[in-house]
A protein has these predicted regions:
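Donor nucleotide-sugar recognition loop
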Residues: 147-150, 157, 161-198
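A recurrent flexible, glycine/aromatic-enriched loop bordering the glycosyltransferase active site
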Residues: 120-155
Length: 299
């Protein structure tokens, strides 16, 4: 039996995004939980973990953001196959290796089988690098990674019983990276699988810079010396150096967000140009524009 669970702060978004995806893939005996007003994401997910730990015959817990829609019809077959390895603790659809901070995208992304759907600039979609597998880069692969993106997590029964989100880290940022580090430290694997999802999310990747910086620092301090490569950088471990590194990653995240916005604006601008050029006023004034061009060329 699988449990599907979300920590819900916007019920209308859950109904529009997560719920249809769950209905698409859930089995007859699956349990579906929507925990409303959970406090922080850490707290909400821990409540769901505690509840799932009491389910007899649990095969796996699917944790998904309320704005995430599962779109793989064969989702259950792929997560079952991944969890058939008793050493696997976490399964996701976006993952990276060489990750040492909460800015996991600074590592080498090995799989990004998701679609980023946004509302800004008239709305649009930005596909991840392996959303369309035939167009994926040669480096794309399924399998073991350092961390997965937390908008979709599938957890093994062992993880449900033994690992919890660290509520001391803050309210949102870094929860997935820290959780994956805990799972790996316990000797289990974090992997990606051939499943796809749509993440309905703003183009703003870091909405609260201070909470980002604090989570970055806390996770670096927590894992210093515990996991090779995590939090490491040249120089001392003074607070100033930690904060400087956190601010650097923050600005990189903002730059990535700006790049997303630029790509998102292009279709909107193209639509506006097309609408203008096919409008009645554009057609009516076409002779006048032609005369103006002739007049300008004769001067």
């Amino acid at each position: 039996m699988f449990v599907f669970a979300s920590s819900v702060t916007k019920p209308d978004v859950y109904a529009a995004c997560a719920e249809p995806g769950i209905r698409r893939v859930a089995e007859d005996d699956s349990l579906v939980w929507a925990l409303e007003n959970p406090g922080t994401l850490f707290e909400g997910y821990n409540q769901l973990l505690d509840r799932a730990a009491e389910v007899e015959g649990l095969e796996g817990l699917v944790l998904l953001h309320h704005d995430t829609e599962i779109v793989s019809d064969d989702f259950m077959a792929h997560v079952r196959a991944a969890l058939s390895d008793p050493d696997v603790g976490v399964v996701g659809c976006v993952g990276a290796v060489g990750v040492r901070t909460v800015a996991w995208w600074d590592g080498s992304v090995t799989l990004a089988s998701f679609l980023h759907r946004y509302d800004e600039h008239g709305g649009g979609d930005l596909p991840g690098s392996s959303w369309i597998w035939d167009e994926a880069p040669a480096s794309a692969r399924f399998g073991e990674v350092d961390t997965v993106d937390g908008f979709l997590l599938v957890l093994s029964p062992w993880v449900v019983q033994n690992i919890r989100f660290d509520e001391s880290l803050g309210q949102l940022h870094g929860y997935d990276f820290d959780f994956c580090l805990q799972v790996r430290e316990a000797g289990r694997k974090v992997v990606t699988a051939d499943v796809r999802a749509i993440h309905n999310h703003s183009l703003d990747l870091v909405s609260n810079p201070e909470t980002w910086i604090n989570a970055h620092i806390k996770i670096a301090e927590k894992w210093d010396g515990r996991m090779p490569g995590v939090g490491w950088s040249a120089g001392s471990w003074e607070q100033r150096a930690r904060r400087a590194e956190a601010e650097r990653d923050l600005f990189l995240a903002r730059a990535a967000s700006n790049e997303l916005r630029v790509h998102a604006e292009i279709p909107s601008l193209e639509r506006a140009i097309t609408e203008a050029r096919t409008s009645v006023s554009w057609r009516v004034t076409k002779p006048l524009r032609a005369l103006q061009r002739l007049g300008g060329g004769g001067r």
